[in-house]
Structure formats: C-alpha cells, structure tokens
A protein has these predicted regions:
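DG-centered beta-turn motif at the end of beta-strands
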Residues: 33-36
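Terminal accessory/targeting
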Residues: 2-30, 40-118, 124, 132-261
Length: 261
C-alpha cells in the first residue's frame, strides 16, 4: 500500500523489445502494482492490469491470504516481473521498527518466503508504507539487497514516481489523480532514463484496505484504458525490473537518494 507523497508536478509505454543499447534520450518505464497477494480482488486486478493494460511489474506480500494463489497466477504471465513488497506493519506478523535485529531477521525471512513461493529471487524489493526509506532502516535494506544483487526501490538508479494515487491530503479521495487523462499526462511527461510508476489496482472484490479499496477499481480502469495503452506505446518503453541489467549494467556505488517524484 502507498503512503501518498506531497503533491508535486511529476514528469513521468507498449511492450517494445529492448534490443539496442540505451541512448541518453531513451525513456523506460516500470509500472509496478503494489499489494499482490493481499486478497483475491487485489490480486485479480493486478493480473488484469498486466494482461490488458500497462502494468509490467508487481510486488508480492508474502504473508497475506492470497500470496500463494497470486504467485501461481503471476507465473502464467512471464512478462510480469514480481518483486517483494516487504510488510512490517500489515498482515499476521508485525515488527517493532526500532529493533534493528528484528527488522533484519524479518526481512530475511520474507525474502526466503518469497523464494519458497516463487522458486526464484524477487525482481526487486520495495515495502509497505515505504518503511525501507526510513533513515534508520535504509542502510539495512540496501546492504541486504546488494548482497543478494536485488534492486531496491529508490536506491537502484530508477526514478520513483508516486503521483498516480487517489488519496491525498487528510485521506480525501481525489479521483482526478487516478483518471486515464491524468495517467496519460504522466506518461507523456516521463523524462529520459529509467522510471518506476507505482499503482494499486484491484477489482470490485478488493477488501485489503477499507480506506483504499473501491479506488483500486478506478486505477484498474485507467491502467487498462485503450487511450492509455496507446499513449504508453508512443511515449516510453515499458519494462520490468528484470530488464535493469541491460539498461543499468552496474549498480551505483552509493545508494541513490529516495525521492517520491
């Protein structure tokens, strides 16, 4: 699930093959759906947003009720990259974020649980409510992900864009920010390089978060809108985190500064 950043103007395509070296003006976009496995409605919406729309990547909550079924469904779509959505604050297990040892142990456990469910390492790691960006936790995440050579959201040379979200100030719903028109404006504004656009689609049965369930259907509608897929095809090259090795051959020596825009 997403914690909305401060509202700022963002400058953020479809699956064209990546067969040539990256040029300085190339625009690559990962469209990642958070909360895979949270429940059946959320998982179905994510799979549909990939099959019929522009979603190229998802992040799995390994301890949630639909995790195993969601992973099975994802395997039927080989171009859908699946990463780990680390959760310390939702689900059956919670962690005291002030206890660094407990945080590390739980992160390692969730990584191993992901491998158990999928048979492979996650394409990337991100986290519920962006806890991996907390100053006291970021070094732990960075060190563990580097040791396993797994990209970490916001710390792997990919610009993170969190503006496609329907809830902003004081929890007020703003459907304008999950409309097809707004999504198209983000796509045409993508800057050169590699970017990630976060999203949270679901179908009408999504029940993961009472504060943000029915909005997921509006996200799904936008992500699968034919106008959006056309604009994406013309504006960017859609990729997932598996493609980073061809585009960013060496990880940055220092962790990039995480930015919500």
């Amino acid at each position: 699930m997403h914690t909305a950043p401060a509202r700022r103007r963002s400058h953020t395509g479809t699956r064209r093959p990546i067969c040539a070296p990256r040029r300085s003006d190339d625009r690559y976009l990962i469209v990642n759906a958070d909360d895979l496995g949270a429940d059946r409605g959320t998982s179905r919406g994510i799979i549909e947003a990939h099959a019929r729309g522009i979603v190229t990547s998802a992040s799995l909550m390994v301890d949630m009720p639909d995790a195993r079924a969601a992973m099975r469904a994802a395997r039927e779509h080989p171009r859908l990259g699946v990463g780990l959505h680390v959760s310390f604050t939702a689900g059956p297990r919670t962690v005291d974020l002030s206890d660094a040892r407990a945080v590390r142990q739980e992160l390692e456990r969730q990584l191993e649980r992901f491998v158990e469910l999928s048979g492979q390492e996650p394409t990337h790691v991100d986290s519920h409510h962006h806890v991996h960006c907390r100053p006291e936790l970021a070094p732990l995440f960075v060190a563990l992900c580097r040791a396993r050579r797994i990209p970490l959201r916001g710390f792997s040379g990919v610009t993170y864009l969190g503006h496609f979200y329907g809830q902003w100030e004081h929890g007020k719903t703003d459907l304008q920010h999950i409309s097809p028109e707004y999504l198209m404006s983000l796509l045409v504004g993508i800057r050169p390089g590699v970017s990630e656009l976060a999203c949270h689609p679901g179908d009408r049965d999504a029940r993961f978060d009472p504060m943000y369930d029915w909005q997921r259907r509006f996200e799904l509608d936008a992500l699968t809108d034919p106008r959006v897929t056309t604009v994406a095809r013309r504006s960017v090259r859609l990729i997932n985190y598996r493609d980073l090795g061809r585009l960013l051959p060496a990880p940055p020596r220092r962790a990039a500064t995480y930015s919500p825009a």
